[in-house]
């Protein structure tokens, strides 16, 4: 009985914390990869409270996905690109090894559509960002990305500026996890922090 009461107390406190944060819940605790799953041989580790993704010796694709699936949500992340900086944030995605089925919000070097939406192993680019928005990305500095997914409606923002807005029937049917990507080719290092989600 005591164990059940204690677990109930922990659950109640968790609900209170989420409510006090306006419904936002942290996905990264700043200490370890609890709640996440590594796909592939690329490097994912925590350093000075930051989540680091870095190319490994295989120079292959790598992913770090949430153990939990998310349907409708608003996600906020901050990232700092070093070296090539080619990465991405996937949503409603499933994995077979390092083959991912789902949708990616691009995180890439300048002039490569950061904030656009790409469908992996499917239709490719669904929407790229306008050329005049390429200067919103701050290479080598911290950037804030926000992603809102409701049904088949997806909106992305970078540093407070809306990047794309799309309605897609196939996305509406998708189910799966949120994930961060390391692109293949080597030379990639990206830092992440303040990864939080609000389920809608």
Feature-to-residue mapping (PLM):
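Positively charged n-region of N-terminal signal peptides that target proteins for export
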Residues: 1-4
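Bacterial N-terminal signal peptides
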Residues: 8-16
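Carbohydrate-interacting regions of secretory-pathway proteins
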Residues: 20-200
């Amino acid at each position: 009985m005591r164990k059940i009461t204690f677990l109930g107390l922990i659950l109640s406190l968790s609900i209170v914390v989420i409510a006090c944060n306006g419904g936002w819940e942290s996905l990264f605790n700043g200490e370890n990869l609890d709640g996440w799953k590594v796909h592939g041989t690329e490097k994912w580790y925590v350093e000075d409270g930051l989540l680091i993704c870095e190319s490994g010796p295989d120079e292959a694709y790598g992913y770090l996905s949430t153990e939990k699936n998310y349907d409708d949500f608003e996600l906020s992340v901050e990232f700092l690109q070093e070296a090539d900086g080619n990465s991405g944030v996937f949503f409603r995605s499933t994995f077979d090894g390092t083959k991912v089925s789902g949708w990616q919000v691009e995180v890439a070097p300048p002039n490569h559509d950061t904030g656009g939406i790409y469908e992996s192993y499917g239709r490719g680019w669904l929407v790229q960002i306008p050329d005049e928005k390429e200067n919103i990305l701050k290479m080598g500095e911290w950037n804030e990305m926000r992603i809102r997914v409701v049904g088949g409606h997806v909106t992305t923002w970078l540093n407070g500026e809306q990047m794309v807005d799309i309605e897609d029937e196939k996305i509406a049917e998708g189910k799966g996890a949120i994930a961060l990507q390391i692109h293949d080719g080597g030379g990639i290092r990206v830092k992440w922090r303040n990864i939080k989600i609000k389920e809608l």
